[in-house]
Amino acid sequence: MRPILVVVLLALALTGCGIEIVSGSATPASSPPTVGSAPDGASDVPVDSTIDAAPGADDSDTRAVDERSAVSITDQFWSGWFADQGLRYVAPTVEGGYTGTDGPSCAGEPSVPGNAYYCPAGNFLAWDEDLMRAGYTQIGDAWVYLVIAHEWGHAIQAQLPDRFVSRAVELQADCLAGAALQGAADQGLVRIEPGDDEEIAQTLQAVADDYRWTDESSHGNARQRTAAFQGGVRDGVEGCLRL
């Protein structure tokens, strides 16, 4: 089977944000994710090693590369984790970006603007590109990795026994995102630089009133979300399952 994404970055120079792809290629899961409506084979295109995704910039092509990379490394981490536990892993399909209300419906419910979501009924992920753009221009590519890893966390919750799924499902998904990104970093797939959690907290606070994905009433405030993310980085998946 061909790899989901051939990553040829030796360095992805980032100013003010710190998610950096460094090496490796993703191993396809049992149900490989695909990004949006990209042509067949599009995910096999090598990534430009000169891309600089600094805060304040928003090149949609560059952001799309980061989205594919985030999908790839997150899928690879969870595929390996489930294999290590002797469990079957079913990767979610990735429908990718939409605008406004033109995203895929979930169990008959339409998509809403400013959101990213996992649909259990269809086992897929989707996100509003306006949400991605908002965080991308303020923090850089770390935002893209956070959003995708968080929604993937919901896909993981759907595959876990109920006793391991916290009542605080959104904060647990933030924790699982931290565990997955740190796990990917430990495997040499991605680099998380000091200060990323503070930058993520600042961005969560900045857009908290503007987007459904950052609505404090359902997801927790920036401080709670950052603490959950840090918990995943520090304690790994097992720590998240104790929430």
Describe each region flagged by the PLM.
Residues 129-146, 161-167:
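Short pre-active-site segment immediately N-terminal to the catalytic Zn-binding motif
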Residues 186-243:
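Long, well-structured alpha-helical subdomains associated
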Residues 1-15:
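Sec-dependent bacterial lipoprotein signal peptides
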Residues 79, 168-183:
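An active-site-proximal "capping" alpha-helix that borders the catalytic cofactor pocket
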Residues 56, 70, 85-106, 194-199:
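Acidic helix-start/capping segments at beta-turn-to-alpha-helix junctions
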Residues 152-167, 180-185:
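Catalytic Zn2+-binding segment of zinc metalloproteases
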Residues 7-9, 18-45:
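Short, low-complexity, disordered segments immediately C-terminal to signal peptides
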Residues 22-27, 98-126:
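Catalytic zinc-binding patch centered on the HExxH motif and its immediate surroundings
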